[in-house]
C-alpha cells in the first residue's frame, strides 16, 4: 500500500461511514490474517488524510466474536497508521453514566472467552505490556477537544469486555459492578491488544446507550434501545470528531515505537518460519 495514513477511525455500531469525508480510494487488502471487516475508506476529512474502517462491516453483518481484528489492525498498520480512535456503544454500570453520555475508559477487564488476542504464538512468543491499555496521550487530546466544544465526558473509567453476542444476565451485570467496572461492551478486545502489539496508539470513545440490566425499574437493554440512542448521539459524535481530527496523526504519541521488539522472547534460531513470514508483514524491521 502506497499511502502514509497516520490516523484511523474505527466505527462501531451505527457508525458505518464518515459524513463529509472526501473519498480518495477504497481498499480491501489481503493480509496474512485474511481480509478486514469491510473496505477501508481513505480520504480527506477536514483537510486531514485519514482511514475509516467500519468494525462490523457496512450493514452490520459481523457479530463481535466474528470481527476480523487481526486483519483490521494489520491493514491499518500497513497504511502507516500510528493512532486509532475507535467508537463503540456501551452499557452503563453506574447511575451517573446516563444513556447518551460519552465515556473515555482508561482500563479494561477481559471477559472474552474464545478470541485469539495476539499476533504471536505458533513458534514465536512475545509478551507485550498492557498495564495501560489505552493511550494516555491520545485520551488527553480527546478530553481537551470535548471540553473545547462543551461536551461533558466521563474520564478514567473501567470498561469490561464480554464475549457476546448475547447481553449480560442480571447476575453478571451486578458482578461487574462489584468489581468496579463502569461500562460494558463486546468489542474493545482483542482490538486494543492487537493495536498495542502493532505499536499503534489506541483510544476508544464510548457512547452509553442503556443501563445494561442491573438497574431496578429500568428496561433491560435491547438492540432497538441501542440503535435509538446511537442515532440521537450521531450529531454530537460528528461534532467531536470534526474538531478532534486536527489533533490526530501529528506524531504526538510515539511512546510505543519499537516496544514490540523488546517483547519478543523466542531465540531467532527457534522461530517458526511460517509465523515469521506472517509477522514480517507487520514488523519488517524485526524479522
UniProtKB/Swiss-Prot annotation:
Q: Where are the transmembrane segments?
A: none
- What are the UniProt keywords, alphabetically? Glycosyltransferase, Purine salvage, Transferase
Taxonomically, the superkingdom here is Bacteria
Q: Which CDD domains match?
A: MTAP_SsMTAPII_like_MTIP
**EC number, as in UniProt:** 2.4.2.28
Which GO terms fall under molecular function for this chain's record? S-methyl-5-thioadenosine phosphorylase activity
UniProt cross-references to SUPFAM superfamilies, sorted A to Z? Purine and uridine phosphorylases
Q: Which GO terms describe its biological process?
A: L-methionine salvage from methylthioadenosine; purine ribonucleoside salvage
The record's Pfam families line, in alphabetical order, gives: PNP_UDP_1
User: What function does the entry list?
Assistant: Catalyzes the reversible phosphorylation of S-methyl-5'-thioadenosine (MTA) to adenine and 5-methylthioribose-1-phosphate. Involved in the breakdown of MTA, a major by-product of polyamine biosynthesis. Responsible for the first step in the methionine salvage pathway after MTA has been generated from S-adenosylmethionine. Has broad substrate specificity with 6-aminopurine nucleosides as preferred substrates.
Name the protein family.
Belongs to the PNP/MTAP phosphorylase family. MTAP subfamily.
Q: What is this protein called?
A: S-methyl-5'-thioadenosine phosphorylase
What lineage does UniProt assign to this protein's organism? Bacteria, Pseudomonadati, Spirochaetota, Spirochaetia, Leptospirales
